[in-house]
């Protein structure tokens, strides 16, 4: 097992050498999410040695850690203080890291009610494309005007710089949590979800799977109990939400390519080409399909959303419009002028 260690100087030296030699770098943690995006060829920059919790004072509701720190280590520290990561990030592997969580920017079933990974990032330390090790943001939540590089790194898949340290806001764990299951049709489920979203219910999870609506209630004991009586259904183990988050439900073993389709919260039922599982109260559709990539991207775009293929290769991320592509291109050129950070991971031209 790797010890806590500040390995930033060695990482900085390797980056500067790569910039000097114009050698592409493959930024790597535990590889738990390596299946996302296009394969990158280059010299490996392994950040797993750069690990350890730098600062955590539960009274401040902020934790700062080096990027190679295992996510399970972070969550264990938070749990011991009765706190949690509000965005409920997936691991997809026992060694998933703090840095990989932010680089991929994926959130779990609680996302619509608590917020995204980006919403809770307060500050970072980053090795830039100029070969400098700089700090952005801090450990307090504040309004940010202009260029917010810390949050820009969320979901950038390591293409804009090397994260070395991340500060995030955390929240207390709910005092009560209860999961329910109701066997109803998809049409009935979507209708009820739309109605519930107009009410102050302590909902933190809504998923339609296996001909049933799965509901998670979290909050004060009184509000959870009242909502349970109002919504009905049978009480089930809360383990379901972890299995959903980690893609361990039987749905994810079905044949076909797995797609993640993000949609507006009020998106209606959709006739998708394959089997689907509905999460985020309808705003996220997991799809197992053998349809062509272009067809899936087109369906998502026409519904006001975007699709991501959950397997390696070209065409996994939603195609960019010409103006948006130019913006990405300019951003990459400004932050990584030598093109050494995970070139082509998201798009071949970037």
UniProtKB/Swiss-Prot annotation:
The keyword Membrane appears for this protein: yes
GO CC entries: plasma membrane
Cofactor(s) demanded: FAD
Matches recorded under InterPro entries: FAD-bd_PCMH, FAD-bd_PCMH-like_sf, FAD-bd_PCMH_sub2, FAD-linked_Oxase-like_C, Oxid_FAD_bind_N
pH dependence, entry free text: Optimum pH is 8.0-8.8.
GO molecular function: D-2-hydroxy-acid dehydrogenase activity; FAD binding; glycolate dehydrogenase activity
Compartment(s) where it occurs, according to its Swiss-Prot or TrEMBL record: Cell inner membrane
FAD-binding PCMH-type domain boundaries: 1-173
PROSITE patterns from the UniProt entry: FAD_PCMH
Matches recorded under Gene3D superfamilies: 3.30.465.10
Catalytic activities: glycolate + A = glyoxylate + AH2; (R)-lactate + A = pyruvate + AH2
EC assignment: 1.1.99.14
Entry keywords, A to Z: Cell inner membrane, Cell membrane, FAD, Flavoprotein, Membrane, Oxidoreductase
Inducing or repressing factors: Part of the glcDEFGB operon, which is induced by growth on glycolate, under the positive control of GlcC. Also induced by growth on acetate. Expression of the glc operon is strongly dependent on the integration host factor (IHF) and is repressed by the global respiratory regulator ArcA-P.
GO process annotations (BP): glycolate catabolic process
Keyword hit for Oxidoreductase: yes
Activity regulation annotation text: In vitro the glycolate oxidase activity is inhibited by the sulfhydryl inhibitors CuSO4 and PCMB, by KCN, but not by the metal complexing agent EDTA.
Disruption phenotype: Abolishes glycolate oxidase activity. Is unable to grow on glycolate as the sole source of carbon, in contrast to wild type.
Cited function: Component of a complex that catalyzes the oxidation of glycolate to glyoxylate. Is required for E.coli to grow on glycolate as a sole source of carbon. Is also able to oxidize D-lactate ((R)-lactate) with a similar rate. Does not link directly to O(2), and 2,6-dichloroindophenol (DCIP) and phenazine methosulfate (PMS) can act as artificial electron acceptors in vitro, but the physiological molecule that functions as a primary electron acceptor during glycolate oxidation is unknown.
Subunit structure: The glycolate oxidase likely consists of three subunits, GlcD, GlcE and GlcF.
Official protein name in the record: Glycolate oxidase subunit GlcE
Gene coding for it: glcE
């Amino acid at each position: 097992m790797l010890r806590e260690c500040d390995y930033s100087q060695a990482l900085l030296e390797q980056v500067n050498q790569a910039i000097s030699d114009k050698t592409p770098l493959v930024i790597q943690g535990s590889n738990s999410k390596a299946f996302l995006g296009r394969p990158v060829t280059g010299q490996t920059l392994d950040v797993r040695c750069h690990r350890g919790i730098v600062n955590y004072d539960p009274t401040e509701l902020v934790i700062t850690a080096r990027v190679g720190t295992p996510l399970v280590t972070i969550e264990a520290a938070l749990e011991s203080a009765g706190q949690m990561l509000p965005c409920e990030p997936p691991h997809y592997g026992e060694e998933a890291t703090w840095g990989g969580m932010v680089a991929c920017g994926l959130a779990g079933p609680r996302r619509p009610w608590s917020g995204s990974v980006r919403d809770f990032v307060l500050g970072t330390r980053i090795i830039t494309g100029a070969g400098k090790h700089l700090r952005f943001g801090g450990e307090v939540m504040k309004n940010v005007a202009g260029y917010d590089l810390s949050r820009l790194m969320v979901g950038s898949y390591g293409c804009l710089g090397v994260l070395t340290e991340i500060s995030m806001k955390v929240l207390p764990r709910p005092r009560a949590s209860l999961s329910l299951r109701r066997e109803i049709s998809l049409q009935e489920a979507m209708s009820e979800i739309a109605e519930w979203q107009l009410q102050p219910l302590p909902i933190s999870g809504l998923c339609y799977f296996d001909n049933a609506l799965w509901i998670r209630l979290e909050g004060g004991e009184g509000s959870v109990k009242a909502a349970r009586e109002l919504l009905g259904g049978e009480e089930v183990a809360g383990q379901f939400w972890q299995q959903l988050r980690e893609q361990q439900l039987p749905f994810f073993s079905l044949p076909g390519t797995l797609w993640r389709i993000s949609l507006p919260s009020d998106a209606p039922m959709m006739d998708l080409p394959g089997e689907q599982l509905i999460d985020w109260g309808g705003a996220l559709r997991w799809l197992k399909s053998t349809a062509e990539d272009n067809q899936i991207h087109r369906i998502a775009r026409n519904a006001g959303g975007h699709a991501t293929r959950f397997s390696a290769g070209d065409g996994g991320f939603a195609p960019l419009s010409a103006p948006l592509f130019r913006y990405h291109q300019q951003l990459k050129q400004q932050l990584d002028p030598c093109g050494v950070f995970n070139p082509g991971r998201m798009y071949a031209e970037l």
